Structure formats: structure tokens, C-alpha cells
Amino acid sequence: MTYEDILGVLGYANGHDVAVRIVTTDRAEVIGIPTSVDTHITAYEVYLRPIGEDETEIALSLGAIELVELV
């Protein structure tokens, strides 16, 4: 998946409060709702709220993402 496609899916999901499934380059999977997508060179990450974990937010490097799909 291209970087532009990854940003497109994450941006859509972030703007519409939709869950995504992310597969990283090391084949780990994360499912959650994006709360922020930061493409600035000093951050370059997406923040996700895992499903059912309203008090938890995790960050993933955009460079570590291989695939994103809407859930």
C-alpha cells in the first residue's frame, strides 16, 4: 500500500470516527479508531484508540504501517 493510500484511509477514518485494522511491517495487527494523524517530520505517527479501551491511546509510526483497511 502506498504512503498516500495509507494517509487517505487514516484521514477518512479519523474524520468519520471509523475503526481501522493496521498491519505493520513486522506483521503485527492493531485495530482501533484513529484520533490523530500527524505527518510532520518530527512526529510522523498516527494515534489510535483501541476498540473498547476508551482510556487508552497508542501511537504508531507511519513508516511502520504496511496496510490499513476500514473495519
Regions found by a protein language model. Name each.
Residues M1-V71:
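Conserved RNA-binding domains used in RNP assembly and mRNA/RNA metabolism
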